[in-house]
Amino acid sequence: MRRWQRARIGELWQLDASPHRWFPHSKLTFPMLNMLDDCSRLFTGSKLYERELLLSYFDFLPAAFLAHGRPLQLYVDYHSIFFTHDPDALTQLGWALQFYDISLRYAPTPQAKGKVEREHQFWQGRLPAYFASEKISEMAEANRHIDALRHHRNHKEVHRELRQTPQRAWNHAQKENRSVLRLAPRCPWWAYVWSVRTPLKVGTDGRVPIGTQRLRIEKPPGTKVVLCLHPSGHYSVLAAAPDPQELPALLFTNHPK
């Protein structure tokens, strides 16, 4: 095993965003989030977003954890979404990951994340021509094709350094008990942990600001509550922030049933 390659799947997943002009007839650049397992080179997630926002990661990461399990660490850069200069503080994303026992490891340079950087080049070299030939110009349709291409990359394309497909390397590690992956938990807080949370106080009118409206909450004026903005765009209001020792007390949601 090479020194710089993790021996077990789930030890370290490299995560990065790559802004690029993906659509050949558009001058706009969009970020693509990519994540791969350091041991097997399996793509655990690849998706385009309008912008690189906290909500983008709150959409991207739980989907990967549900599909593949929870790794021990994510290898990231010093973007403010991941890093705070206060050593005793966590970003909202860092806090969400810690809630599910996942830590962050910071790459000192872009070159230190060479594996995921090379995979950016793979997508940049392939997708614009593919989207042109398939006449794809909408992000939702593009992401459906990216899912299929990621599956093909994992299962069918032999990795030059591993001399086998990433999926075969992943399966081989599992067979040899070289895995530290944990299942995504059945947790009542799951949807709220992966949301942008804002502390609020109920106003003197018994209402709180939710989106462009002020809506009534069944709590006395002055009560502290937590507003959650979910990746889907809907809102929830909780009586308290996520706490593994408690159950969520949902005061409001506009999520369609």
Q: What is each PLM-predicted segment?
A:
Residues 150-257:
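C-terminal, beta-rich DNA-binding module of retroviral/retroelements integrases
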Residues 61, 65-86, 107-110:
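Acidic/histidine-rich, metal-coordinating catalytic segments
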Residues 87-92:
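Charged helix-capping and loop-helix junction motifs
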Residues 49-50, 221:
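A generic structural motif
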Residues 93-184, 231:
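Charged alpha-helix within mobile-element recombinases
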Residues 1-43, 54-63, 67-70, 98-99, ...:
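Mobile-element integrase/transposase regions
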Residues 41-46, 105:
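Short small-residue beta-strand/loop micro-motif enriched in glycine and branched aliphatics
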